[in-house]
Amino acid sequence: MAKKKIAYLQFPGSNTENETKNILLKHGMSPRGHFWNDSTEKLKYYDGFIILGGFSFEDRSRSGIIASLEPVVNELKNQALLGKPVLGICNGAQILVESGLVPGNEKFETLVSLTDNKRVVGDRIVGTGYFNKWCYIKPSENTKSAFIKKNGKPMRVPIAHAEGRFLFNKDLESEILQNSLIAYKYCDSEGNLSNDFPINPNGSLHSAAALSNLAGNVMAIMPHPERTLQNEADDIFESMKNYIDSNSKFSYKALNFESKKISLKKFNKSPKTKELLVSTIIADNEAASVEKCINSLGVKAKVKKYIHFEIDSVDSLDINSIILSLIHI
């Protein structure tokens, strides 16, 4: 029997391709590299997909957002509708969340946030920002997923991210819990749960380490199961292969949830302050990337980034003089 072909999707800034190749080979699958700008037609010939970790497009604007708007991800949605398994690891998870593939409502709207880490003990924040360590995760018994082994045990996996905290609003939280979409949760070595650091390393709601779509064939996971050294996370890839080999009848089901649009209010500066807008005198790669992205979506616009300062004084200081001094530093 021919080995199942798994495409690992690479964007500018992706990494861990070698680890991903090795773990797929170990489990009897055939890894195939697919760059973001390769023909999307090729996706039809793969049996499953992994979106690599890393820093796609240098995380410009927001982690995963630019990659999520690439044509290759639009075609990935079509392949997911057919039942093919899609696993997003770390930055790949961020891309799946931004694209709306996870948790996956009818319109593929962005419903969930993967935001800045917040290490919490009780009601105290003990750390924020990038964090890497080995931790434990365990599968949720009631989650339908192509990436969960029946009676699976806690597994030791590394994390390495700055924006891995799953957040969702109250209405969506109810849907996620009711449908058991949290596929893996952070735990200790015995499988015990806690919302506190260090067991929960980033402050994710309900200790979520991975989130699934309702159909069970798409999963966004923040830890790196492909980086394990001693078979710790084999269950995930073994389950993926078994899911493909089973060739079971598949019927895609979207989450019955519609996002509420938030209207942005126009910013109005306080009349008591002086405003200072600062831009770079060198090329701003972040603004250039955003401009190129929205232009490709049919929105013709120029993008320039400014840093906004407001200067206020509680006494009789000459604010105009202060601003002139700052400009000439």
Feature-to-residue mapping (PLM):
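Amide-donor transfer/coupling interface in amidating biosynthetic enzymes
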Residues: 38-39, 45, 78, 112-266
